[in-house]
């Protein structure tokens, strides 16, 4: 059966509008996808959604909501006391803290204050993010069933804890198509030199969708995409002739076999040819004015840093790339949380603010949805031996924070 010809609930993919959203809506992709589908459905809604593209700043490891966005003054007062049995009962705990004889509560050692007209509570660790409080919707009631990193990250990227499903960027590419035929619909950037749970390519893969919808990972070296540049002595015209010949051969084979993978291969060859001209224009930041680096920081000049990737995300958004996925590892603080989370915030706070501010000043924030968050949160009790100034927090799937900005989102 040709699955592309199936419609309605009888499709093995369930690709009616309703079934599609129901099946994929488990992860954050459901929010982004529903928003964008409404924007292009042409149904004459009274308040049509605005988002045309998504920038997802994924913080891998599970940032501590208690120390960043979810202000808990009562918890601070109760620091050192035992987690009540009434709360602990029935809670799923990891093997790292589930066998502890004691689970002492520990509040945040960091100060919180309210910001903007919206009065949103934000930690002192995020002074720059606090400047965009009135552009953000902070959701402190996020919930997941996953308690370990692999299933948790997979769920947030695909809507399923099991591997093999299409990622949200792949779904958007498949469902909405391209806004710029000279660039991929879906681009992934990973902060270099970070440690933590491995980030595998299936997180930006296409699953059972055609391979052309998978994310294209940009490298942090001078060649953003491996093997894209033409070899010395090969002209653009000769490369065009070779591709035309390959295209004809693939068409003959496609007619004989009906193998849809051949269509994907043809599309990828054509995209690669076009990107030989379009990619240098996107990745070359040499013409960015001084004001850009005053905003993002000097770290934005260093390829592969979170700041550089945020700047790259803005440039890709300007070129109408549909889905731009950033990954930043290092949030898994089972120990030494006070020191570790400070380092993470120093790396990400300024650039996250700069990206939202930059999109806004360029008129791009209204139709770009920015998402910041991880796969789960952290516990309100101490992992390991209690020390109020040097402690860790275990994984906590039942409560974590994510913020959204742009695309019509309001505080």
Residue spans of the language-model regions?
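Ligand-binding pockets and gating/stacking loops
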Residues: 2-411
């Amino acid at each position: 059966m040709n699955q592309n010809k199936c419609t309605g609930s009888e499709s093995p993919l369930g690709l009616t509008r309703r079934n599609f959203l129901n099946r994929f809506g488990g992860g954050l992709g459901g929010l982004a996808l529903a928003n964008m589908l409404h924007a292009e459905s042409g149904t004459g809604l009274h308040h049509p959604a605005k988002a045309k593209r998504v920038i997802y700043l994924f913080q891998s490891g599970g940032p501590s909501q208690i120390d960043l966005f979810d202000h808990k003054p009562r918890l601070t007062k109760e620091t050192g006391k035992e987690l009540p049995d009434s709360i602990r009962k029935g809670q799923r705990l990891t093997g790292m803290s589930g066998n502890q004889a004691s689970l002492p509560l520990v509040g945040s050692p960091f100060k919180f204050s309210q910001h903007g007209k919206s009065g949103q509570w934000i930690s002192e660790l995020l002074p720059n993010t606090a400047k965009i409080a009135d552009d953000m919707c902070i959701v402190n009631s996020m919930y997941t069933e996953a308690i370990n990193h692999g299933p948790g990250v997979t769920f947030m990227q695909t809507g399923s804890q099991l591997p093999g499903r299409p990622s949200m960027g792949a779904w958007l590419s498949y469902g909405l198509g391209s806004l710029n035929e000279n660039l991929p619909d879906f681009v992934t950037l990973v902060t270099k030199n970070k440690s933590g749970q491995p980030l595998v390519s299936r997180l930006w893969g296409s699953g059972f969708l055609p391979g052309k919808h998978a994310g294209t990972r940009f490298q942090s070296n001078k060649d953003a995409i491996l093997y894209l540049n033409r070899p010395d002595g090969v002209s653009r015209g000769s490369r065009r002739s070779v591709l035309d010949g390959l295209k004809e051969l693939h068409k003959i084979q496609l007619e004989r076999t009906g193998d849809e993978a051949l269509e994907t291969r043809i599309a990828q060859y054509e995209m690669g040819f076009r990107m030989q001209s379009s990619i240098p224009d996107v990745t070359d930041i040499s013409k960015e004015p001084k004001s850009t680096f005053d905003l993002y920081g000097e770290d934005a000049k260093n390829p592969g840093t979170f700041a550089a990737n945020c700047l790259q995300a803005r440039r890709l958004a300007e070129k109408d790339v549909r889905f731009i996925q950033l990954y930043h590892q290092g949030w898994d603080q089972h120990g030494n949380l006070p020191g570790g989370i400070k380092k993470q915030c120093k790396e990400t706070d300024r650039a996250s603010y700069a990206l939202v501010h930059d999109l806004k000043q360029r008129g791009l924030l209204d139709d770009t949805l920015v998402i910041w968050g991880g796969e789960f949160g952290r516990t309100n009790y101490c992992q390991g031996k209690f020390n109020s100034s040097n402690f860790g927090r275990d994984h906590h799937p039942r409560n974590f924070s994510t913020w959204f900005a742009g695309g019509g989102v309001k505080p």
